[in-house]
């Protein structure tokens, strides 16, 4: 196979990996945790993965502590947890 063909194959495999959704067996366990605003009093929009609805939802994050199932963007939540 030529080097151009190898580069094309590598590019297609990389694109497939990026676009393939996370399967439930590959999903991090913290994606099962409930939304946790934490003890602080900030009012930040954040997102968490809801395993019952199998989607990412908005919630108000206080700005500290909480748990790892807290994302700044819905895209980050989907990329990490959504199947």
Swiss-Prot record:
Reported tissue expression: Expressed by the venom gland.
SMART domains: KU (SM00131)
Top-level division of the source organism's lineage: Eukaryota
SS bond list: 31-81, 40-64, 56-77
Domain BPTI/Kunitz inhibitor: 31-81
Other facts noted in the record for this chain: Negative results: does not show inhibition against serine proteases, and voltage-gated potassium channels (Kv).
Name of this protein: Kunitz-type serine protease inhibitor homolog mulgin-1
Source organism per UniProt: Pseudechis australis (Mulga snake)
């Amino acid at each position: 196979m030529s080097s151009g063909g190898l580069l094309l194959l590598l590019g297609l495999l990389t694109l497939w990996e990026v676009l393939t959704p996370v399967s439930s067996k590959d999903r991090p366990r913290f994606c099962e945790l409930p939304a946790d605003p934490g003890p602080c009093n900030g009012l930040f929009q954040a997102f968490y993965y809801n395993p019952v609805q199998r989607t990412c939802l908005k919630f108000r994050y206080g700005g500290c502590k909480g748990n790892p199932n807290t994302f700044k963007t819905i895209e980050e939540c989907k990329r990490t947890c959504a199947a």
